[in-house]
């Protein structure tokens, strides 16, 4: 496998940083060292960038930047830049030689002799790369018309891959962009377009200077984009202003411009009211970006969304629509939390991401309460957060960071999913109106500036009259999470003792001290009004004294309302009742959490997978909540196909297939419920342990335009083809080739790439693994999409040979891929394994690589956890465990 030359360049940069004297200057190390950022933040102010770029070349963008700033005393100045080349450097009118000492391919050093006390101006001419992946300017080619579309993506520290700058969040700057592009192209950027000059073959676009923004938020897009503009008020009572949606010309007709523009502007208005600060960045445009590597990016004035998640090729489900709405609300919330007030350093990444997720949920609760938004919040956040926070690779919410080069490792469930859960606990602790007053004060204190988590807690603490220091120590700085076990004793139909015992999921990391938490304990009665008891958990064992003497409930649940943050393990009596009756609980949010509590017991290896599977198969035909049904189906398949060994799977596979087929064909259900069952059926049908005729059924569906009575559109057709390829169905190759001809769109080409990755043969796997690293034309989204197909659980023996190579490439992956890729890479490579031999390989690799960075080691440990649980569950329940047979003949 060939590793690209970036690793060599970084090594050269490190060597140059040491210099000819042999004395290492830590500031010049690759990346953006914290020591450099701290020094610059203390000395540099009033930064302005005037950035000019020429986008008329295929693979590179020549550019020039003028950097203006103030520095109170004469000392050297270091800019960050790791683009393709530097051709000229001028400082305050003085030409500087371009040498290895002035540009070490990571930083540009302006010597003190060229710097003034006070105002300074540095000009650099440079070249930035344009590529499908691994560049600051991403190129995506539309297969339908051959047109190229460009956009930038600079988070967390790729601004210095685009142009020389002070690439740290607490040196905000006013930015003016000037972009030359082909005449047929449009260009959008953070600022509003002010003028366009015409040349013979190009247009030169100039944009207004922005408000102060961090470098990672600078953005532009260029190409033959189509656009739709509407005049909308961005704040209640304000005059209407143009809001523009941009998309590829070939997809614009499919985009729901009216709906999406309204969704964005409604969010801007609601959040402006809630925060007490009107939208702070003037104009608002958003782009549906092709092949975008994640859900969205909050650039002020130019928000980018993932085109694939916003333009549907088949009828969307309610879950998809709610997910799209949540993404919009999340990115719009960032305009205040992240853009208007920004964390000082990426150790406080949670401050923007956690808040954006939490505010999106609060907004959904206010705008669309009928959608049960707190159920959505729980399902989208808590299981994912718990699944990471209970591992040996967990981190605190605040994550120490010595160099922005490692910032990508900080992205993941702790900041995106745990942090909003912690904020929900804080909101519950101080009260909603007090919480709002604190947040408004926080924003007023730091307009267009930077702040830390301590500033936030100080503002909320002042509003509430509480000292939140201990809260910060417990929930922001302490790694890990509590597991709360319920103990219930009764006599003569009355409770004699109800206690909550907590322990750390990872005592080595967290210590054994209890977490302090406010929660609500639910006593549930089928024939009476439930009893809710507020409880302050302050000790290892908390006695719920208010429950003594009350009638014994059907079940107890110690996190009613989802205000607490803990894995709750029900007592045995509650578990027994829930396994039989959880589907009868009417409150959808509570029902979702109860299923989660049962599933946590499976993952703790205290509840047999077969018992959960039996309960799920009895409940699914009656479940009418689309999101719960989807989550339950996913867990059912994990219980039977991953945690259940061959015997259990062989026994249950036909029942599961019939159950899913019946659900997909059930016209009494909503479209989304039926579609989720169909998708699950397609994705899980397998010949791994027994022949199944269901694959032939899937194959026949491709000859028509419906499946189980549902319309058969391109995404579902591709899912069927991928399954046929993965299972070596006789028609697989012919079906794949036919679908390639049928769907020649950009999305069709991506799906074909994914489908072929599923082939269970060594030659295909070798070809894909090499191409992931060696094909510079391969878009990162394509790689990410193909990982799960490549690492199919049923192909673990074939893919095990790539387990260690996948681990060996981690430093390269961290340097060259986007923020979420690292987690997806490890989740697929390690998560696609199920055997003890694979676990042994991971552990041996960790032992053999003590020099591995702590951040990468934690990422490996996070992914390892699911493999370790799989092995432990399979060992504890070699046949899946006991299960009820009372209802076994239902399907």
Annotated model-derived regions:
Residues 85-92, 468-469, 479-559:
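Beta-strand-rich binding/interaction modules
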Residues 495, 511-513, 526, 533, ...:
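Long, ordered, helix-rich scaffold segments
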Residues 6-15:
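Bacterial N-terminal signal peptides
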């Amino acid at each position: 496998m060939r590793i690209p030359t970036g690793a060599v360049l970084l090594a050269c940069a490190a060597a140059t940083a040491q210099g000819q004297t042999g004395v290492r200057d830590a500031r010049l190390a690759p990346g953006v060292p914290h020591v450099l950022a701290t020094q610059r933040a203390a000395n540099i102010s009033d930064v302005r960038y005037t950035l000019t770029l020429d986008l008329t070349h295929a693979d590179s963008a020549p550019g020039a930047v003028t950097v203006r700033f103030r520095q109170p005393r004469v000392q050297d100045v270091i800019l960050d830049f790791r683009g393709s080349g530097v051709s000229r450097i001028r400082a305050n009118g003085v030409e500087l030689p371009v040498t290895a000492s002035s540009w070490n391919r990571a930083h540009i050093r302006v010597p003190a002799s060229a710097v003034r006390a006070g105002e300074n101006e540095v000009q650099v001419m440079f070249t930035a790369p344009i590529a499908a992946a691994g560049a600051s300017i991403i190129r995506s080619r539309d297969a339908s018309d051959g047109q190229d579309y460009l956009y930038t993506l600079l988070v967390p520290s790729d601004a210095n891959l685009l142009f020389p700058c002070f690439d740290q969040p607490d040196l905000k700057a006013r930015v003016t962009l000037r972009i030359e592009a082909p005449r047929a192209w449009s260009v959008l950027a953070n600022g509003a377009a002010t003028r366009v000059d015409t040349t013979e073959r190009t247009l030169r676009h100039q944009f207004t200077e922005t408000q102060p923004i961090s470098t990672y938020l600078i953005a532009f897009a260029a190409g033959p984009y189509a656009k739709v503009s509407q005049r909308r008020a961005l704040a209640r009572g304000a005059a209407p202003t143009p809001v523009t949606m941009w998309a590829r010309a070939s997809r614009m007709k499919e985009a729901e411009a009216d709906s999406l523009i309204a969704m964005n502007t409604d969010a801007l208005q609601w959040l402006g009211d809630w925060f007490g600060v009107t939208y702070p960045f003037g104009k608002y445009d958003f782009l549906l970006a092709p092949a975008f590597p994640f859900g969205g990016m909050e650039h002020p004035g130019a928000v980018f969304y993932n085109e694939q998640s916003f333009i549907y090729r088949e009828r969307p489900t309610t879950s998809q629509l709610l997910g799209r709405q949540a993404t919009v609300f999340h990115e719009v919330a960032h305009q205040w939390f992240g853009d208007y007030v920004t964390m000082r350093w990426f150790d406080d990444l949670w401050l923007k991401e956690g808040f954006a997720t939490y505010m999106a949920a609060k907004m959904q609760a206010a705008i669309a309460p009928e959608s049960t938004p707190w159920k959505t919040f729980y399902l989208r956040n808590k299981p994912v957060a718990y699944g990471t926070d209970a591992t040996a690779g967990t981190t605190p919410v605040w994550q120490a960071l010595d160099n922005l080069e490692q910032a990508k490792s900080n992205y993941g469930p702790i900041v995106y999913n745990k942090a909003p859960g912690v904020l929900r606990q804080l909101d519950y602790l101080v009260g909603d109106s007090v919480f709002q007053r604190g947040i408004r004060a926080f924003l007023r204190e730091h307009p267009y500036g930077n702040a830390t988590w301590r500033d936030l807690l100080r503002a909320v603490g002042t509003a509430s009259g509480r000292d939140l220091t201990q809260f910060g120590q417990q929930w922001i700085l302490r790694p890990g999470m509590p597991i709360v076990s319920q103990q219930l004793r009764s006599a003569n139909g009355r409770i004699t003792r109800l206690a909550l015992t907590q322990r750390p999921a990872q005592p080595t990391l967290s210590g054994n001290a209890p977490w302090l938490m406010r929660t609500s304990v639910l006593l549930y009665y089928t024939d009476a009004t439930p009893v809710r008891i507020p409880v302050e958990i302050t000790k290892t064992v908390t006695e719920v004294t208010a429950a003594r003497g009350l009638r014994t409930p059907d079940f107890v649940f110690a996190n009613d309302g989802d205000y607490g943050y803990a894995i709750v393990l029900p007592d045995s009596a509650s578990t027994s009742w829930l396994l039989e009756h959880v589907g009868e609980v009417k409150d959808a949010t509570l029902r979702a959490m109860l299923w989660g509590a049962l599933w946590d017991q499976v993952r703790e290896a205290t509840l047999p997978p077969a018992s959960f599977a039996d309960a799920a198969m009895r409940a699914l035909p009656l479940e009418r909540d689309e999101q719960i049904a989807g989550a339950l189906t996913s867990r059912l398949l994990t219980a039977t196909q991953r945690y259940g060994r061959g015997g259990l799977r062989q026994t249950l596979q036909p029942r599961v297939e019939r159950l899913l087929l019946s659900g997909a064909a059930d016209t009494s259900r909503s479209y989304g419920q039926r579609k989720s069952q169909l998708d699950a059926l397609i994705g899980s049908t397998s010949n791994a342990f027994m022949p199944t005729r269901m694959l032939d059924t899937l194959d026949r569906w491709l000859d028509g335009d419906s499946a189980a009575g549902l319309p058969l559109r391109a995404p579902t057709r591709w899912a069927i083809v991928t399954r046929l390829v993965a299972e070596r169905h006789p028609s697989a190759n012919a079906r794949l080739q036919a679908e390639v001809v049928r769907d020649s769109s950009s999305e069709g080409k991506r799906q074909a790439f994914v489908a072929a990755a599923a082939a269970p043969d060594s030659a295909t796997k070798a070809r894909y693994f090499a191409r992931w690293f060696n094909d510079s034309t391969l878009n990162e989204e394509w790689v990410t999409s193909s990982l799960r197909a490549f690492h199919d659980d049923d192909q673990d023996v074939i893919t095990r040979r790539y387990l260690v190579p996948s681990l060996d490439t981690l430093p390269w992956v961290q340097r060259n891929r986007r923020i979420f890729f690292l987690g997806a890479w490890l989740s697929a490579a390690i998560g696609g394994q199920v055997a003890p031999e694979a676990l042994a390989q991971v552990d041996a690799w960790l032992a053999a690589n003590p020099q591995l960075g702590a951040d990468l080691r934690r990422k490996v440990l996070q992914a390892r956890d699911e493999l370790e649980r799989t092995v432990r569950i399979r060992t504890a329940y070699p046949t899946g465990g006991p299960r009820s047979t009372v209802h076994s003949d239902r399907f």
